[in-house]
């Protein structure tokens, strides 16, 4: 495995909505794609993977992120050597600051159909989950459950569907100070700010939060490793705003490449078919609940 570190990029930070993702599988045949402009001369034998240095459990510079493992499995399935191009920024900036600048060629971790890139067909689907202590004996499956309004604190990620629904059921204002306390009261307005997935789980374990609601892939690792038994329940996909607009709770996950890199995408789709057993093993080891893909 190769590892390539790049100097810090100095683009101004801006607050944004967070998107989650991973990779996909699809048929299709093509010759090895030509090297993108700016790629090394031996690019056809290397898979340059855009990755965040410190975004657990997705990506970590030591390669222990589950998306790092998926990237390696995909590279091996395409007979390429994985080369990680590391960013010291959150993954939300990888498309703009790395992929679009042709510093790397592939992102593991995008929702299927992300309009900024070409995405492969999904290789797995998962959803948001309610996390609680097992000894609480809670049985919450939907944002429409009235029991939610009896809870003291519910931990959710900023910019997530869970934050939207916390607002919709009228609990966000009273929970806001608590949520900001989890990031030392840093505002996400002028900088990227997010609650660490591990912190959300520790809040449930300690009893500071009655419930956490998060995308299963970002917290499954911590639920699985918790010394206090925790219950993880998929959120029913019936959430909606007061005006009837659906707030999706489940997402297909894909690999992303630049819009002009169709040949590379075709090759990756073929590789994903071959890598599927290994990818499924990685997801199972992580404890991520998977659903049938729909796209």
Question: What function would you assign to each model-found segment?
Answer:
Residues 29-116, 191-194, 285-289:
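Extracytoplasmic small-molecule ligand-binding "clamshell" domains
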Residues 10-22:
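Bacterial N-terminal signal peptides
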Residues 52-55, 125-137, 184-186, 224-272, ...:
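Periplasmic-binding protein-like
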Residues 1-13:
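Bacterial N-terminal signal peptides that target proteins for export
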Residues 29-33, 88, 161-182, 186-188, ...:
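Ligand-binding clefts/hinges and TM-proximal coupling segments of bilobed small-molecule sensing domains
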Residues 72, 76, 81-148, 159-160, ...:
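Acidic, polar ligand-binding/catalytic clefts
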Residues 53-56, 60-76, 130-189, 195, ...:
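Bilobed "Venus flytrap"/periplasmic-binding protein-like clamshell domains
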Residues 73, 88-105, 118, 185-226:
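Short helices/loops that flank or line small-molecule/ion binding pockets
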